[in-house]
Amino acid sequence: MKIDSLKEKLNIFKIPLNGIKLIEASAGTGKTFTIVLLYLRLLLGIGEKKIYKKKLLVHEILVVTFTNKAKEELYIRIKDGIQNMYLTCINKTTSDSSFQFFFKEIHDIKEAIYVLKRAQNDMNSSSIYTIHSFCQHILQLHTFHFNDIFEEKIIENEDNLYLQATQDFWRRFFYTLPEDIIKIIYQDYKSPDHLLKTIKPFFYIKSINFPTKILNNKKLIMYHEENIKKIIFFKEMWLIYHKIIQKTINDLEINKKIYSKFNLIKWINKITEWAKSETKDYTIPSILKYFTKKNIEKNTINNTCSKYIIFEESEKILKKKFSLKNVIIIYAVKKIHQFLLKEKKKKSLIGFNDLLSILLKTIKKEKFLKDLIIKKYPAAFIDEFQDTDIQQYKIFNLLYKKNKTTVLFLIGDPKQAIYSFRGADIFSYLYAKSKIKKYYYLDTNWRSSINICKSINFLFSQNINPFIFKNIPYIPVVPSSKNLKMNFTINDVAQTPISFFLQEEKEVSIDDYQVWISKQCANEISFWLTCAKTGKAKITTKNGEKILTANDIAILVRNRKEADLIQDELEKLNIISIYSSNKNSVFQTLDAQELLWILESILEPENEILLQQSMASHILKKLSLVVENKTISNKNSYFIIEKLYEYHDIWEKIGVFQMIKIMILEYQKNSFCTEINENHIKNLNFLHIGELLQEQFQFFHKKISLIRWFQKKISTKTQPEYNESIKCFDESPSIKIITIHKSKGLEYPIVWIPFSIDFKKSTLAIYHDQKSLKTFFDENYSNKFLKIADEERLAEDIRFLYVALTRSILHCSIGLACLIKKIIKNRNNSDIHQSGLGFTIQGGKTMNYEGLLEKLKKLSINNFIEVKNNTDNFSFSRKPQTISLICKNKFLNKKNIRNTWSITSFSQLNKINKLSKHHQKEVALKELCIKNQEKKNQSLLTIHNFPKGKKTGLMIHYILKNLHVLKNKNSNWFSCILEKYNIHIKWTSVLIYWIKNIINTPLNDEKIILSRIDEKSSIRELEFFFPIKNMLYSTELNKIIQSINPTSITSPQLSFNPVKGMLTGFVDLVFIWKKKYYILDYKSNWLGKNNNFYSSIHINKEIVKKRYHLQYQIYTIAIHKYLQKKLKNYNYKDDFGGVFYFFLRAIDCPKKNNGIFYTMPNYSLIKKTMTLIS
């Protein structure tokens, strides 16, 4: 591949308008404006009369970009450009120097006015597309001309299809494999989701070269058996030589500190023990490295041991990386791809990438279509060309490469190619560049201040190849003279354009660094805003001088986790922030659940359960307050039901969306939030969901079908469709937190980049051949190809850094530390040279803290860059009226909903922020005890070593839910249940025996037995809701808990955010026995190896530790409130029988009464808790 092309600074009026032209536009150099000016040249025919016989019309100029947002921006900018040029021609002058210069090139003003006016009128027929909409348009054109039928439905987001395909692959192929192989696979892939996350990059890479041909389970098993044979062969060889190895090594002049007598005996014994064991997996002892030829020669004086074959074999077996990981990747990619093709064909679906493949094949095959496109679009622009892939490039290259009467502009910036995760391929760009003799570049920066431009120039001029690849050069930008006065000042002192915040420690872990830099970032922003309050922090931009506000500051991150870290620190200092890259589905908000309750109630207004659910929603808060009143009147009930019938009629007549709008308007006056902003957000979400429901209703005949679709959307946790993401409400001053990916193309006066030194080394050996630029995958994960893959990862990290830095107009603060990814004894150097920022500063060399500090000092000598260590802790105080913004911010960042209405449960209240060290140790010891016990009792199947965990608890609850039909169930039914919950069917007889004992064990002296409870006298899994009217605080609830059970003072305190709204839960069983109502809760907790561990002493300890006394208090309140409404002369002491907690693992014999806990909650405490809550 040719490395260097000739380069020339772009002159808009001199660049020829024929052939393929590549223009590289660095960040801030006016790429879009360049497209506008070239577009105007084509419209007005300036300079190219020989090539184009007539001036081009707007529909003849093709403009292609990669996102809808970019398409909309281009449309607006081109339309505005035409308007401005039109006004310039009318007025014969303009204040814009570019248009004034353009005006001088026009010879016939009247003709130009006519052309521009026509272009303005024709803009609705302009040919501005995304790459995928362009493909779709051409294929439809092909359909028209060839009477072909293009019936496929285009899907924009294929994530759910990929997941479905992966799950299908997982079931079909993994479930049928031998257990030994499944265990090996499970070490690398825990679930279909995990597998998909690993292999997804392969689906974006076209024409990847796979070396292996394992395409079925039979070949996979053979491959596994070959690996096992190699390991067995080595083991046998070791057992032959192991007795003479110690003597052989001792006879060498070897380093006795490492190869001491003690170490040799210990190592040899461990390896020998392994060699004698059965070979079921690919485990190789790491200590075998001491017996490799290379290591022994390294530690001997004469450097020779070549005559000993065992040392050579040790080296070979360690080099051979035994794994199924890479084989599974290739196997899965091919099978899942086949499944996708089959599924798409079956459902007549087509993905965006399929459009590209189809169009490329069609153009290659049919010359008529190719000629038709060229005739239709004699000029074309490909915007953001650095984000292309090989298929996209081939399409446009085929169309325009040999045509001298057309022009194709490829415009982009390879330094900003950061979208490899979705298929963009920088190597396709480099390939295109290698085919072009001369490329043009833009170098005037119109965005940033002079000092920012100089500092970024200086930073990226430190290395010969700052972006690693030689054909991605850094051309220093020239700041526009118009930006001379642009500045950021505090107390009238100009701030250094780039500040590095360096943590003063020689070794820093990523976790410690993230905590430290988050605080530094929040503290500095707090300081700026505090200064701004007194008018001491100012910014001067193109629009003049103004006081700094939160809106002027952006924090750039890679992902949601980093955003959360920053938001938490900002919140501590009372600073409002919005995470602009929120991609959560609107269906996963509390508002969606509330709206579902309301719609369900509208369909069945007289259904009491649905009515009460809908009253839990904020939008019907006023009505719910009436319903919750104990003295509810028939008149009020009638009014509520009438209102729901009214909404039903509106829905019937004008649709669900209009009905939701009317409902919102009616209840707007009954504000359900402390401030209007949160009210606005909630309304925004309701309307958003209303639009989606209205759109979906066209596919259903009945309202109930729409409700079921809505229910499924809420319950299914999948990636949101393009139109389902939460719409950000962004009107008030707030710090913008945004991902670097999403920030591309945007600009901010002040930028913070806290986490620029973090990196993830490449774990997939996907790499490009530097000559052919083809993509390969090395299944053996050899160091050579992993190194190439990681170099490509590092190159993109540097491009990430460039994109992040160039978002800033006036100032950029960056975090930095001597990051150590893996602690190694006596290690001096950090790992940051493997990050984009570390490479740029250190030139790719490893350095310690002192070396890094020295480099930073050299960078800071010209006053463009400064180094800081710590910021003071400022707490930024807001004005009272901005409280509403907190509400807004918390809503948009769902993990931090505070001081707002919500639905909670015992489980949520019971969550502790951090376990004490003592408790962590206790849990760890218990888990170890369980594992050891399991190992000892593997041959003996009892309820005490029955599989543990959540799935077992769910299974037992499911079985006992079917209590009254268990008598009719045979062993096959129980086996099916075990399989359903992924538990081996060998436990069938144990399970049957266990369940039989459970349902026949007396709960007390009155002989309450589950099997004797009448079905009509019980309710299973009773769901309850009751309001928390007063704000509930954890401190107050802790006092109640301690008064219920004084020993609970020894357990960790509850710690939750103040909550108000609804308390919900499920009671396993409520039943009547001898005219009294009882609560029963099943507990599948494992407390010990036999029945003795379920004595009253042990159970009471478990009750305290898990805070079950709070749980049964809540359950009792729920049933008490329920019975108050249902029974006329209800009395707690006379009608309520108490609470049973049934510890099921104790029930190994019906005659023993261990495992049963009973209590009759104190009525005064019940009242006290009820008063606290409501």
Curated annotation (Swiss-Prot):
Its cofactor is Mg(2+). Binds 1 Mg(2+) ion per subunit. ATP binds at A25, S26, A27, G28, T29, G30, K31, T32. One of its GO terms (biological process) is double-strand break repair via homologous recombination. The keyword Nuclease applies. Residues 1-852 are annotated as: DNA-binding and helicase activity, interacts with RecC. Residues 479-745 form the UvrD-like helicase C-terminal domain. Its EC number is 3.1.11.5, 5.6.2.4. The keyword Hydrolase applies. GO terms for cellular component: cytosol; exodeoxyribonuclease V complex. Mg(2+) binds at H957, D1068, D1081. Pfam families: UvrD-helicase (PF00580), UvrD_C (PF13361). Residues 4-449 form the UvrD-like helicase ATP-binding domain. GO terms for molecular function: 3'-5' DNA helicase activity; ATP binding; ATP hydrolysis activity; DNA binding; exodeoxyribonuclease V activity; magnesium ion binding. A helicase/nuclease that prepares dsDNA breaks (DSB) for recombinational DNA repair. Binds to DSBs and unwinds DNA via a highly rapid and processive ATP-dependent bidirectional helicase activity. Unwinds dsDNA until it encounters a Chi (crossover hotspot instigator) sequence from the 3' direction. Cuts ssDNA a few nucleotides 3' to the Chi site. The properties and activities of the enzyme are changed at Chi. The Chi-altered holoenzyme produces a long 3'-ssDNA overhang and facilitates RecA-binding to the ssDNA for homologous DNA recombination and repair. Belongs to the helicase family. UvrD subfamily. The N-terminal DNA-binding domain is a ssDNA-dependent ATPase and has ATP-dependent 3'-5' helicase function. This domain interacts with RecC. The C-terminal domain has nuclease activity and interacts with RecD. It interacts with RecA, facilitating its loading onto ssDNA. Heterotrimer of RecB, RecC and RecD. All subunits contribute to DNA-binding. Interacts with RecA. PANTHER family: RECBCD ENZYME SUBUNIT RECB, UVRD / RECB / PCRA DNA HELICASE FAMILY MEMBER. HAMAP family: RecB. This is RecBCD enzyme subunit RecB. It comes from Buchnera aphidicola subsp. Acyrthosiphon pisum (strain APS) (Acyrthosiphon pisum symbiotic bacterium). The lineage of its organism: Bacteria, Pseudomonadati, Pseudomonadota, Gammaproteobacteria, Enterobacterales. The gene is recB.
